[in-house]
Amino acid sequence: NLTVDMNYKLQAIISLSAVVVSCGVGVYLAYTGYGVWTLVVQTLLNNMLNVVLLWCCVRWFPLLSFSLKSFKELFNFGSKLLLSGLLETIYTNLYTLVIGKKFSADQVGFYNRAFVFSQLPSYNITFIINRVIYPLLCAQQEKPEILKQHYIHYLRLTCLLIFSLMIGLCCLADPIINIVLTDRWSPAAVLLQLLCIAYMWYPVINFNYLVLNAVGRTDYVLKSEVLKKINSVAVLLLTIPLGIKAMCAGIAVSLLFNVFVGMFFTSKVISLSMREQWKELLPVLTISVSMGIFIYGVGLLIDNAYAKVAIEIPIAVLFV
């Protein structure tokens, strides 16, 4: 209800209250010698407080009754989302499993650091934006023309932000890794660059997913997820023998393929062809790539890692 009503202030207050209390208890338990159980208690307490505070503020409580009609309606919608979510979870963990089995501890560490850095702009910012945009899309599900306008507008804004951040991070990967993690982790820079190119497409994929959910076409969500994972697993199997860099490059290829799949199914629910969607994205992509080329060229003239970051970030901001 709070998300649909766009009451993010109350959600923030509830989340912050739960975090403060649970972290306080966690710190106390850590100092009194509870060890790893501290993390267990802190996580459980945080979730319990969130539930209790939401119940108290929203005044909604579950009833001890079962509605077959509601179950059928929700199952038809939610079961496909559940299956697509399971496919995504299995695939994500498959990469970690393969890397852990096939490569050395050093390479696993380099990949892990590169992966974490690449997620900060793409996944986290997109997740925050989605919480605001999804209710807007749902509110216009009966008005396809307005839904189409919202989709184009917010897609371009989000992609301008994420594309610029990811391409900027790609160009500054080496100095950032050396500054934050020291030069011992410098091999992670190449992996970070490849993953930045891969995950810059995440907001496009996610926006297609949001539109399909907003109009209730979770069958398209599941079909698209099956196609994506078949392609991604095939790419994974082909790149395993070629090394960890090839695997990261394979992720980029897979996610670009996912963009085309998502756009194809989105074009079926709103009057916006794949060509028109790319036409909307092209100016944003051109600006971001031009910025990347420019700051990369500037970086070639600077040797010091700190100076590169200090000079190139303001230039990138002014460029965009």
Language-model features: locations:
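Helix-terminus/linker motif at the lipid-water interface of multi-pass membrane proteins
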Residues: 28-30, 89-120, 135-139, 174-184
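Alpha-helical transmembrane segments of multi-pass membrane transport and lipid-handling proteins
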Residues: 24, 28, 32, 126, ...
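Interfacial/gating helices of multi-pass transporter permease domains
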Residues: 36, 73-77, 81, 97-119, ...
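Helix-loop junctions and terminal segments of transmembrane helices
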Residues: 3-4, 62, 114, 118-162, ...
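Short runs within selected transmembrane alpha-helices of multi-pass transporters and secretion channels
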Residues: 1-3, 14-26, 39-55, 84, ...
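Alpha-helical transmembrane segments of polytopic membrane transporters and translocases
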Residues: 48, 80, 95-97, 109-126, ...
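Transmembrane alpha-helical segments of multi-pass transport proteins
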Residues: 279-320
